[in-house]
């Protein structure tokens, strides 16, 4: 199964944070699943790093590719269809990064691994 990680799920997985549910961890660790991280999440993390709200274990351009490879996590590019879908979404959520994740989930029919229950209002499949 293809699964799209919300940014917090990715970070909590990497840091072995107890906030990541046991079920979410199982989904991510299941080698039969194709785990994806949106390019939007990379942008979100980069902004948080530049604002001093996030620290990671090294330089962004070295740490992120290393962790993606180490954990067999693929990147989901942002397509025109994804950005067009954002324009049609109701405003259940104002966070632009989360709205892009919702659009990617809907367009690509890929469930989101996230603790954020507001995603449910969009009709996406959320796994936690």
Predicted segments — roles?
Residues 16-17, 48, 89, 125:
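Residue-level signal for well-ordered alpha-helical positions
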Residues 42, 50:
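Binuclear metal-dependent hydrolase catalytic cores
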Residues 1-37, 51-66, 108, 117, ...:
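Short, well-structured N-terminal submotif of metal-dependent ribonuclease cores
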Residues 122-128:
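Acidic, glycine-centered active-site loop in nucleotide-sugar glycosyltransferases
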Residues 9, 41, 82, 101, ...:
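Alpha-helix capping/helix-boundary segments
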């Amino acid at each position: 199964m293809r699964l799209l990680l919300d940014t917090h799920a990715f970070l909590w997985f990497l840091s072995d944070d107890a906030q990541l549910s046991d079920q979410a961890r199982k989904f991510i660790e299941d080698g039969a699943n194709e785990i994806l991280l949106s390019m939007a999440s990379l942008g979100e993390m980069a902004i948080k790093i530049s604002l001093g709200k996030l620290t990671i274990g090294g330089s962004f351009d070295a740490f992120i590719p290393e962790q993606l490879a180490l954990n067999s996590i693929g990147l989901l590019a942002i397509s025109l269809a994804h950005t067009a879908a954002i324009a049609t979404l109701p405003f259940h959520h104002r966070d632009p990064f989360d709205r892009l994740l919702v659009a990617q989930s809907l367009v690509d029919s890929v469930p989101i691994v996230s603790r954020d229950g507001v995603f449910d209002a969009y009709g996406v499949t959320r796994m936690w």
